[in-house]
Amino acid sequence: YGKTESDVTFAAFHPQLGRFVTDHLELYGEGTLLLYRDPRLAVAGGIAGIGGRYHFWNDRGWTPYVIGIAGLIWTGLDIPELDRTFNFQLVHGVGVRVVPPRGPGWIVELRNHHISNAGTAGENLGVNAATVVAGVQWVLR
């Protein structure tokens, strides 16, 4: 923090698959596809293979939740903060899920998406991106 200098702009696609293990806790994984526009065109792809989403309510049509997930990511982005092609990703944040009685629902999340080499090379400055994620979801019962 304080040493990073790159402004990074990207669009993301995060397909997710999860399973509720309790009434409130969902374990899930997600794919990551990032299309960078700034500072130059680049692509990143990876998998966040283990994560959790804790839903505060389970008796309403909507619920706030907290998330945390970790995984691996490959990136072609050439910036000082990422001195490796193969990196790690950590995501944490808060969100709201709306689940209608039938049909698709939606989610909105505010996340911190951290990408770094986890101290395996160089200075390990990493990239922290405050991101807003909105999506459509289906709950299979």
Predicted regions span which residues?
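Extracellular loop and loop/strand-boundary signature of outer-membrane beta-barrel proteins
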Residues: 1-3, 36-39, 77-82, 118-124
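Residues that define the transmembrane beta-barrel architecture of outer-membrane proteins
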Residues: 7-13, 42-48, 62, 84-90, ...
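Short conserved catalytic/interaction loops centered on acidic-Pro-aromatic/His motifs
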Residues: 81, 103-107
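Histidine-centered active-site/metal-ligand motif
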Residues: 114
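Gram-negative (and chloroplast) outer-membrane scaffold detector with strong preference
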Residues: 11-78, 100, 137
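Outer-membrane beta-barrel "beta-signal"
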Residues: 98-100, 126-141
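Specific aromatic-rich, kink-prone transmembrane helix
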Residues: 93
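Transmembrane alpha-helical segments of integral membrane proteins
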Residues: 109-111
